[in-house]
Regions:
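Conserved nucleotide-cofactor-binding alpha/beta core module
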Residues: 1-15
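Rossmann-like dinucleotide/flavin-binding elements
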Residues: 9, 36, 51-56, 65-157, ...
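A Rossmann-like FAD-binding core segment of flavoenzymes
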Residues: 11-66, 132-222
Length: 236
């Protein structure tokens, strides 16, 4: 689901149908790009179809939609505690009814996990929106649920800014942290304990959430050959 509750799957199916029916769009499925030469305005690209046939395409622009996926992480006890999951996993559990928000008393979310650092210097641009979306969904099902979001910067654009305000109005608590003072997660008597510096109170605070939700970076799929053909980087 999206921030406003729409189904991306339904939208995607409609979009695919429109592309298939468009008279000026030619679609190649199961096709591999083998070579590309030229410059902006004058490209010549060779593709290999599923039948093994080579076809040369003349075009003026190249848009590389390489795609991405949630990066792996071992931070904050992920993979060791069932109470530590990712935003994508939380969304799946909520969508398919595997998690009942009314059974929870508190949920903590940590943004920029393994992101905007030496390993992944970029911002994925979607993590904050996902956190807001899931936080608002949780609050809609359980208004008394305490939701805390630890963040470095809230990166939402355009109309999504309204959902940041809406989350605050719903009672979601936002706690900012610096890269050199990240939240610390330990376990005491089988419960998660989060210790973090509150910049407003100027002291450490502790939380014991029922669930900890992480936002690891979006990383590119392995498209090294395609990137080499077009001379582009995959980490930007």
């Amino acid at each position: 689901y999206t921030l406003n509750g729409d189904s991306p799957q339904e939208y995607l199916l409609r979009l695919i149908d429109q592309v298939k029916k468009h008279p000026r769009i030619k679609t190649f499925l199961n096709t591999e790009i083998t070579d590309s030469k030229g410059r902006a305005g004058r490209f010549s690209t060779t593709v290999k179809t599923k039948e093994g046939k080579l076809e040369e395409l003349k075009h003026g622009t190249v848009i590389l939609a390489t795609g991405g996926h949630q990066g792996d992480t071992q931070a904050y006890g992920y993979g060791q505690s069932a109470a530590v999951i990712t935003q994508a996993e939380l969304e799946q559990e909520l969508t398919f009814g595997k998690l009942d928000p009314t059974t929870l008393k508190s949920v903590a979310m940590i943004q920029c996990v393994d992101s905007r650092d030496d390993q992944h210097q970029y911002c994925s641009r979607v993590c904050c929106s996902s956190a807001l979306k899931n936080a608002l969904f949780l609050k809609s099902k359980n208004p008394n649920l305490r939701v805390f979001i630890f963040y470095r910067d809230i990166m939402v654009n355009g109309s999504a800014e309204a959902y940041y305000t809406k989350a605050r109005q719903a009672g979601v608590m936002f706690i900012q942290y610096e890269i050199d003072e990240k939240p610390r997660v330990t376990s005491e008597d089988g419960r998660l304990v989060i210790t973090a510096r509150d910049p407003i109170l100027n002291r450490d605070i502790q939380l014991t959430p029922d669930l900890l939700v992480l936002s690891p970076p979006v990383v590119p799929y392995d498209n090294k050959n395609l990137a080499k053909i077009f001379g582009v980087e995959l980490n930007q």
